[in-house]
Amino acid sequence: MRLKGFYIGRAQRVAALLLLVLFGECVWSIAHRPLDANDYRYARCGREMWERPSPLAGYFTTCGNLNGDGTLAYRVAGFPLTVQRLVLLSVDHFRKPENREFEGGILNGTTWEARHELAWVKYLLRLPFCLFAVWLGGGLWWVSKRLFGNEGGAIALSLYIFCPAVVRYATTPNSEILALWGLYGMVYTAMGVAHALQGPRKKWKPRILLLTVALGLTAAAHLLAAMVGFVAGAAFFFYLAERRRAYVAQIMLFVALGAMAIVFASFGFHLAAFTYVFTGGSARFWFSLAAAGNFVRSPVNAGILVAAGVALVVYATTRRSRYFGNTAPLLMLLALVPLYTTQVVSAPWLWALPFLFTFIGGVFADMLESRQRKVFLLLSGSVVVTQAALCWMSMAGMLQS
């Protein structure tokens, strides 16, 4: 089946089904988790960014300087609520004065105060983050499929959708899932730009523009993720550009300037608030394996850990698995796992997970083309089924994630 030039085959239908499962997991989690103070904080700050930024000098919202967080998560959380408020006020405007429901201005208050007037607050606030997780899942599948084939893409996506940490962060307002989305996309977009440079010039600009947007949105989500992605993307870009390496520095400079403009726009072009990007300390980091240790010790990640262990052994012992497609995500994994932020509460270990799943998908795809195909086919199915069961048990509260 073809849809406007896009071929929809069995692999695409399987991927769509898996992404639908992830969306269902997110909706179930959202429905069973009540709103808390963190939700209302994101709603308040996000709505203020869209509706009325703080007039206080040096501050962008009445929440202060957002604890060093980026602006993107607040804007994503507040946008649906702001749109609903505008729709309600617009509809109310066409009623007769005596029939108007919002004359008292209650919709101008906080989300907590207007919770009885605003419908579906829980879903409007949290579903955008779920959609970003689904979007990332689609990107993860597409990258893995292009690199490793249908089986590699299916394995990588299956582990992603059944990872309890992904589901947990995809169902609450936070900067981590957006940084995760942006960092993964930025690294592989940089590789795509390097490949585009080998072709006609007409294909350069769209990919460079896409890289600029990816870096800008990632920086608006989390500055450290953008810095890591910029350095890693530039390194992979330079490695792959080959005869076009003279263009790398120029392109990355323009990308950085464009990304800075996007971050400035995310602060509503308020210069005083924008300067906090450079003084807030959100990019300060050091090294620790404590968070990675917690992930490894959690029983809900057993399937992922078994697959990762097997993939590492195969990569170390089998020459056919040691090529750039597998090495690049492994290098990103090794770079991200030991990071932790010292100024703000963050989870760089989470950003490493899509690269881990890409690495596993690549190595397993290699072995599925070898004489050990039946063994790895059985292992792949067992790992995915086990991880799905553990994920659903975690969601139901039967296992501590």
Feature roles, as predicted:
Residues 2-5, 188-198, 227-258, 358:
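Perimembrane helix-loop-helix junctions
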Residues 6-8, 145-147, 151-152, 197-205, ...:
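Membrane-interface helix-loop-helix junctions at transmembrane boundaries of multi-pass membrane enzymes
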Residues 12-13, 96-112, 116, 140-162, ...:
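Transmembrane-helix signature of polytopic, membrane-embedded enzymes
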Residues 37, 165-178, 345-349:
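Short acidic/glycine- and proline-prone juxtamembrane loop motifs at membrane-interface regions
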Residues 43, 51-128:
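Interfacial juxtamembrane loops and adjacent helix segments
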Residues 135-140, 237-241, 300-323, 336-337:
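Hydrophobic, aromatic-rich transmembrane alpha-helices
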Residues 145-147, 151, 186-208, 218, ...:
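Membrane-interface transmembrane helices that cradle and orient dolichyl/undecaprenyl
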Residues 156-157, 205-222, 333-337:
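Membrane-interface alpha helices of multi-pass inner-membrane proteins
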